[in-house]
Design a protein with these regions (language model features):
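Acidic, Ser/Thr- and proline-rich intrinsically disordered linker/docking segments
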Residues: 115-266
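Short recognition patches in nucleic-acid-associated and regulatory proteins
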Residues: 4-24
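Residues immediately within or flanking Cys/His clusters that coordinate Zn2+
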Residues: 5-10, 28, 269, 284
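Short linker/helix segments within small regulatory modules
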Residues: 20-29, 280-286
Length: 296
C-alpha cells in the first residue's frame, strides 16, 4: 500500500496530486485540475504523453480568445446546443449557460467532414405479475420501445475527430409501464394513469403527446408500441431538431468549400469597360488599374 498513498506530482503544472486526484497519462501523472481543462470531446488521455497534453492545453488556452470573439447568430438544440457564428464561419457545441467561462472548442465550418442523426432504438419486454407476485411473459411476448436521438459531427481537429451528443434529456417512450399487475390489466403510463385512445402523456415543456386517435398499446393482438412512439409529437420534435442541426452544418460546410474552390480557380483576364485595360480582377472583382467594378 506504500505506493498507493505515495504523494504524486502533476507533470503538467508541478502541483501536488491529492489521493483521488490523479489522472494517469502514458508517461506520467496529471492532476484533476489540469485534466478538467482538456477538451470535453477528447477521450485519449491515458494514451497521451505529457508533452501531448501540454500541447493541447496550449491549444485550449488559445481557444479562449476565439470564445471571446464568438458572436452567436443562430442557436440549434435544447440542452446541448450548437451555436453558430455565421459571420465568422465558426461554431461550438456546449450545454453551458455561461459558455464564455466553459471555453467550448470553437471550430470552423470548414472543419466539418460529416454530420448525421443517429436514432437509437431499445426495447423492453412487457411482463405482468401473477398471483404469487412473480414476473411472467405474455404469449406472444410484448415489447415497449424507446428512442434516443444523437447528433454525430465528424471534424478535422488534432485532438478529437468526433462530437457526439444526445438531443433528448430522457428516452422517448410514451411513458409506457413495463410491469402490469396482471395478464388482463389495462395498459398504463408510468405514474398510474390509464392509457386511453393511445394519446400519450404530455411531458413538462412538451407541446403535445402521441398521435390523436392512435390505438391503445397492446390492444387486441398487438405486441409492440413502436408505431405509436414513432408517431408521437415528442419523437417528431427530436427527429426534426436533429435534421435541422445536421442540415445546417452540412449546408455551411458546403458553402465554405464552394467558396474555397472558387477562390482557388485560375483568374481570367478581362477587358475593363472603364479604362479599356486588360486586367485580372482583384478579390473584390475590380480592375487592378482604375478600380472599376469589372465583375457585376
Amino acid at each position: 500500500f506504500g505506493k498507493l498513498f505515495e504523494k504524486k506530482e502533476c507533470a503538467i503544472c508541478g502541483g501536488e496530486i491529492g489521493l483521488l486526484g490523479n489522472r494517469k497519462l502514458e508517461d506520467g501523472n496529471c492532476c484533476k485540475n489540469c485534466a478538467a481543462k482538456l477538451s470535453p470531446w477528447f477521450s485519449d488521455r491515458r494514451q497521451s504523453t505529457v508533452e501531448e497534453i501540454k500541447e493541447q492545453l496550449a491549444y485550449r488556452e488559445a481557444n479562449q480568445e476565439k470564445v471571446a470573439a464568438f458572436r452567436v447568430t443562430r442557436t440549434l438544440g435544447e440542452g446541448m446546443k450548437v451555436l453558430l457564428d455565421e459571420d465568422d464561419g465558426r461554431f461550438m457545441v456546449t450545454s453551458a449557460r455561461n459558455w464564455q467561462e466553459a471555453n467550448p472548442d470553437v471550430l470552423s465550418f470548414s472543419d466539418v467532414t460529416g454530420c448525421k442523426l443517429d436514432i437509437d432504438e431499445s426495447k423492453t419486454e412487457i411482463q405482468y405479475k401473477d398471483a404469487e407476485g412473480k414476473r411472467q411473459s405474455f404469449s406472444p411476448r410484448r415489447y415497449a420501445f424507446s428512442y434516443d436521438f444523437y447528433i454525430v459531427i465528424n471534424v478535422n481537429n488534432p485532438y478529437f475527430n468526433e462530437i457526439r451528443f444526445k438531443l433528448n434529456g430522457s428516452s422517448v417512450d410514451n411513458d409506457e409501464e413495463t410491469l402490469l399487475d396482471g395478464p388482463n390489466a389495462q395498459p398504463c403510463v408510468r405514474g398510474g394513469g390509464l392509457r386511453t385512445g393511445g394519446a400519450g402523456p404530455i411531458r413538462p415543456g412538451m407541446p403535445g403527446g402521441s398521435r390523436p386517435g392512435a390505438r391503445p398499446f397492446m390492444g387486441g393482438s398487438r405486441t409492440s408500441n413502436a408505431d405509436e412512439v414513432r408517431s408521437s409529437m415528442e419523437y417528431r420534435q427530436y427527429e426534426e431538431m436533429g435534421r435541422e442541426i445536421r442540415d445546417a452544418l452540412l449546408q455551411v460546410r458546403e458553402q465554405v468549400r464552394n467558396e474555397a474552390v472558387a477562390a482557388a480557380a485560375p483568374k481570367t483576364a478581362l477587358t475593363c469597360p472603364f479604362c479599356g485595360a486588360t486586367t485580372t480582377p482583384d478579390a473584390s472583382g475590380c480592375c487592378e488599374f482604375c478600380g472599376g467594378a469589372v465583375n457585376g
